[in-house]
Amino acid sequence: MVLETIGRRSGQKRATPVLYLREGNSLVVLAANAGADRTPAWWLNLREAGSGEVIVGRRRIRVTPRLLTGGERDRVWWAFVEMYPQAEHYTRFTNRELPLIALEPAGT
């Protein structure tokens, strides 16, 4: 999937390929940055803008981000790791909690 955001400093459109897990009506993405201590720019941009667009196959969908927390995050984390085991490996490289973000269709 490709996530499109607007750069918080540049104002330019940015496109980033991201892995996703389908969870109900949401597409869940992991802001891992391969385990780096820095939060990925796409998440900073999306959080500041409050919305973005994703391209899944031939569909373009306007989305709003929602940071997963608590028990919901824990449950979805293990589903994400099952889909992409490398995600668990990333936690060894950083002290930050890797954000899991539900991208929800705008207007729902």
What are these regions (language model features)?
Residues 1-32:
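Short beta-strand segments
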Residues 24-25, 106-108:
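Short loop segments at secondary-structure junctions
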Residues 32-87, 92-99, 105-107:
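Short, structured beta-strand-loop surface elements
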